[in-house]
Amino acid sequence: MTLPLLGPMSLSGFEHPWFFLFFFVVIGLVALYIVVQLARQKRMLRFANMELLESVAPKQPSRMRHLPAVLMILSLVSFTIAMAGPTHDVRIPRNRAVVMLVIDVSQSMRATDVAPNRLTAAQEAAKQFADQLTPGINLGLIAYAGTATVLVSPTTNRESTKTAIDKLQLADRTATGEGIFTALQAIATVGAVIGGGDEPPPARVVLMSDGKETVPSNPDNPKGAYTAARTAKDQGVPISTVSFGTPYGYVEINEQRQPVPVDDEMLKKIADLSGGEAFTASSLEQLKQVFTNLQEQIGYETIKGDASVGWLRLGAGVLALAALGALLINRRLPN
């Protein structure tokens, strides 16, 4: 949590937990204070002239006189927590990652169950995704129907990606597996160029489709979608699938209506096999929200940040109050 004036504070993820041994010192000080107070009380009871004692001493000494000591102990507790090095989760933009946006442009994407049609709505949401994605991420674009084509190699230039999205054209058949394999090849190519470390940059495939794979007919074939998803899993590239459309979509072929219901099941299995996550959307608004959620997941990474400063500030503030209280209540610093 983050508190005003103090900053982030946490009670987890300690980097130097051995500093908690200092709590034994704090406990010792508490015990010493109690012993001193009891001894002080005994000395007062041995006062020779009890009548004089009752006349000069308050009948019930104020408990406020213990406040400075309590505050000092609390400040030591706060300082001990700070020295133990607590951490908290910090989200920072990624600047070394690759995302391949793979869009289905088969004929079923001209269905009008999503206004004005599936492809146009997908184009609008995809361009929003490109705009929202953090600037340091390399974004590429692949369109697939019967074959897959890399329209934009992974780049931080969002304008080129959006221009290519606007130019998407419908084609026959649906080769989802080829679209995934093409994305994996593009990721491997750019990863070798921008590696910048011992490991390749983190990568993700975002697959948007509305229907079942038709080429090949069996998704478990060597070039099928399920085989491609397993390959993505082996390469450490999760696939986020977005199934887009409704069960009532249709297209007209030779003046006859051909049902093209969305196939959520296949896309979910692709995501599961790859270690990714499946999303569904049946309207443009839902699709935009899905891409916003994806941007939040992909565009940022969570790291451990220091959360000790807040405890140091709290300890210093409480210690100052202890000193002030000692001067006002006891007219001296607590001992």
Swiss-Prot record:
GO-annotated cellular components: plasma membrane
Keywords assigned by UniProt, alphabetized: Cell membrane, Membrane, Transmembrane, Transmembrane helix
Residues that span the membrane, as ranges: 18-38, 67-87, 309-329
Protein name per its UniProtKB record: UPF0353 protein Mflv_3659
Family affiliation: Belongs to the UPF0353 family.
Domain VWFA per the UniProt entry, residue ranges: 98-294
Pfam family, one: BatA
Location(s), subcellular: Cell membrane
Highest rank taxon of the organism: Bacteria
Organism: Mycolicibacterium gilvum (strain PYR-GCK) (Mycobacterium gilvum (strain PYR-GCK))
Membrane topology, as annotated: Multi-pass membrane protein
Record lineage: Bacteria, Bacillati, Actinomycetota, Actinomycetes, Mycobacteriales
Listed InterPro entries: Aerotolerance_reg_N, UPF0353, UPF0353/GerABKA_families, VWF_A, vWFA_dom_sf
